[in-house]
């Protein structure tokens, strides 16, 4: 019995030692893997750079009805998403949420903060090659002020807007309003396309369903029914080669 006891005890001691050796090797291998992965990640961040390839397809899924592509009537998330891709504004918000000039090059105000003068960037064009200028801005604001247009924008009736020149427009407020620049994020429409369209008919006009002339990073190629009953829409867009943002 004593011999058997010594034999079993010796085997158990050896087995315990083997387990400790295996555990040590597992720990060592794990540490090597972690160190190697860390070195690879640091190397990747230091010596590689993310680049973008030309071409390809951009897809975006959004919820909500798509009844219009006219940005002045955009109400659902789908309509607003399409508007941001098709139309430029005087100002927009960048990825960090800061207000940034889009079509606008600069803005100046008087000491009383009742006059704001916006200067447009030079060389702006619509997707058909026609110049985009301050007359388009004034035309759009007049639509916002016109109750017959029934747009989704309000609060412009008390603001006086005048052209200074082809690339400059002045806004005169009845009282000081320091954050006025944040009101200049509305999309601009082309006067040379819509000037003869009555404001009361703009919502139902062909342009509102198929805006063939735009100013954003994309131009419309096709609006397609995604289902047989027309409840889902697919908007096909192509890059706008005349987009001022490149």
Regions found by a protein language model. Name each.
Residues 54-67, 105, 115-118, 137-140, ...:
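Short, well-ordered beta-strand elements
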Residues 41-60:
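Ser/Thr/Pro/Gly-rich low-complexity linker/stalk segments immediately outside membranes or between
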């Amino acid at each position: 019995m004593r011999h058997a006891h010594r034999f079993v005890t010796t085997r158990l001691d050896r087995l315990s030692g083997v387990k400790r050796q295996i555990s040590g090797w597992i720990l060592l291998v794990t540490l090597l893997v972690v160190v190697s992965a860390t070195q690879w990640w640091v190397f990747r961040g230091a010596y590689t750079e993310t680049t973008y390839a030309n071409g390809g397809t951009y897809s975006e899924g959004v919820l909500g009805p798509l009844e219009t592509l006219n940005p002045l009537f955009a109400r659902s998330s789908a309509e607003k998403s399409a508007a941001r891709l098709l139309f430029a504004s005087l100002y927009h918000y960048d990825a960090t949420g800061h207000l940034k000039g889009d079509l606008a090059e600069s803005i100046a105000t008087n000491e009383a903060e009742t006059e704001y003068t916006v200067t447009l960037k030079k060389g702006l064009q619509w997707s058909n090659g026609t110049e985009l200028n301050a007359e388009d801005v004034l035309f759009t604001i007049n639509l916002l002020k016109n109750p017959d247009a029934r747009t989704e924008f309000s609060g412009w009736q008390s603001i006086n807007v005048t052209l200074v020149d082809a690339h400059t427009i002045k806004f005169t407020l009845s009282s000081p309003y320091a954050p006025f620049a944040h009101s200049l994020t509305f999309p601009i429409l082309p006067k040379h396309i819509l000037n003869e369209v009555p404001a009361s008919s703009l919502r139902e006009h062909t342009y509102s369903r198929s805006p063939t002339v735009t100013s954003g990073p994309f131009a419309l190629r096709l609006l397609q029914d995604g289902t047989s009953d027309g409840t889902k829409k697919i908007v096909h867009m192509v890059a706008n080669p005349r987009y001022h943002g490149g």
